[in-house]
Curated annotation (Swiss-Prot):
Keywords: Allosteric enzyme, Glycosyltransferase, GTP-binding, Magnesium, Nucleotide-binding, Transferase. Binds 1 Mg(2+) ion per subunit. The magnesium is bound as Mg-PRPP. This is Uracil phosphoribosyltransferase. GO terms for molecular function: GTP binding; magnesium ion binding; uracil phosphoribosyltransferase activity. Catalyzes the conversion of uracil and 5-phospho-alpha-D-ribose 1-diphosphate (PRPP) to UMP and diphosphate. It comes from Thermus thermophilus (strain ATCC BAA-163 / DSM 7039 / HB27). One of its GO terms (biological process) is UMP salvage. The keyword Magnesium applies. The keyword GTP-binding applies. Signal peptide: none annotated. Uracil binds at I193, G198, D199, A200.
Length: 208
């Protein structure tokens, strides 16, 4: 499994504000969108290009445009939605899928309650989005669901990851590249990332 750590100064600056408990929902959403957008630069660095010609106001110019497979952004509900919004500003023609999972508070295992993907997901470059890679259970299940529907070469994007979550993905999906903004210390007894930033979904939507 390959891990790409996006440690750009702008990402780390915005991540500092995401971690701050004083940051309210509006600012948190905007920051998370911006971090996701900045992370996408690295996650999509290997997209294919082809040459074509356009007419500038002065003369014809040889330029490069995206080619190859079309893109799909797949959010793990609900927190992954905020990452979709940021990345869509860069690739507005990408299709969007949703996978609904919740974590059982006793076992910490994920439970699927919803899935809706582009019908041609097997023909697209898919990016699985979830701000927090904690135990890795939800991301692992989501990756399995994507593979069952023919998706290959899926990249997992998470703002924060715990070592336990990375180990789980390496074990279950060693062919997956994980793109993260930070790797934190550990999980606590409740399965939260330490030091983390709290419950991303609650902080995005102002819920408890």
């Amino acid at each position: 499994m390959r891990i790409t750590l996006v440690d750009h100064p702008l990402v780390q600056h915005k991540l500092a504000h995401l971690r701050d408990k004083r940051t309210g929902p509006k600012d948190f959403r905007e920051l998370a969108e911006e971090v996701a957008m900045l992370m996408a630069y690295e996650a999509m660095r290997d997209l294919e290009l082809e040459e074509t010609t356009v007419e500038t106001p002065i003369a014809p110019a040889r330029v490069k445009v995206l080619s190859g497979k079309k893109l799909a952004l797949v959010a793990i509900l609900r927190a992954g939605l905020v990452m979709v919004e940021g990345i869509l500003k860069l690739v507005p023609h990408a299709r969007v899928g949703h996978i609904g999972l919740y974590r059982d508070p006793e076992s910490l295992n994920p439970v699927q309650y919803y899935i809706k993907l582009p019908p041609d997901i097997a023909e697209r470059r898919a990016f699985l989005l979830d701000p927090m890679l904690a135990t890795g259970g939800s991301a692992s299940l989501a990756l399995s669901l994507l593979k069952e529907r023919g998706a290959t070469g899926v990249k997992l994007m998470a703002i924060l990851a715990a070592p336990e979550g990375l180990e789980r993905i390496a074990k279950d999906h060693p062919d997956t590249e994980v793109v993260v903004a930070a790797i934190d210390e550990r999980l606590n007894d409740h399965g939260y990332i330490v030091p983390g930033l709290g419950d991303a979904g609650d902080r995005i939507y102002g819920t408890k």
